[in-house]
Amino acid sequence: MIDLYHHGSSVCAAKVRFALGEKGVAWEGHYLDIHKGDQFEPEYLKLNPKAVVPTLVHNGRVIPESTVINEYLDEVFPEVPLKPNDPQARAAMRVWTKAVDEVLHPACAEVTFSACLRHRVKRLPPKEYEKFLASTPSQSVTPQWRERRRDLVTLGFDTPGLGEQYRLYDSYLDKMEKSLAHQLWLAGDTFSLADIAMTPYVNRLDMLGWGQMWEQTRPQVTAWFERIKARPTFKPALLDWCPPDLTAELLTFGRQSWPSVERLLSQAS
């Protein structure tokens, strides 16, 4: 029995839903509205003290961290392998998944909050607004995430250091373009956990209406993303769980934010 605690817009939860879909493994979902603070409820904090999603429970065993979850799923359900056979390709796969966890995910959090989610948080009633910001554990997405998220919500695109995060995000599209120039998928010629790991982060840019970051200048990334979107598991895992109002707001606020994004991307680091 697999239970997955998740949210529709969480890139990390999407990674796990994508892997479960590719594996063809049935699961029971427990939906947490992370924008209303469901992840701070005491019962969930017992499962995940970081107050983040996803958390997977398999036969009573609690497994946090999306990359760890996906590696676990690939070992427990080996019928549809998501790791390359070649050791060098497996190493390349893990370079991608490690980079996602350590570098790209924190950047994605800052990008998403500055461009869109801060507007949702600012609409909360004053008591809920303060409770939401105060309930965030400091050791969450990054060290001092509680303080950083407050800055992102209140300062938006004027948050100090935000441009570095946008340019870092953009640099990973360059890394993808280079890697895909000589192979079909990120870790070689077979679809793997590397592609699953990167998909939600490219899709996040797409949902913000920023496809121009690759469509005209990065043909390999463009072709890769088209192959990804053609997979039957993509839409159920990446799109269908996102609440329609949030999907609409990501696109609306993303498009409104694009001039600010262009400005940050054009600045020297």
What does each of the following model-derived ranges do?
Residues 34-35, 191, 243-244:
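Positions that flank functional sites
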Residues 106-226, 230:
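GST-like fold's C-terminal all-alpha helical module
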Residues 45, 91-94, 197, 222, ...:
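Generic structural signal for individual residues within well-ordered alpha-helical segments
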Residues 29, 53, 189, 214, ...:
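A generic structural-conservation signal
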Residues 215-269:
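Long, positively charged, glycine-interspersed low-complexity recognition regions
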Residues 1-143, 253-255, 261-269:
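GST-like domain detector, emphasizing the conserved glutathione-binding G-site
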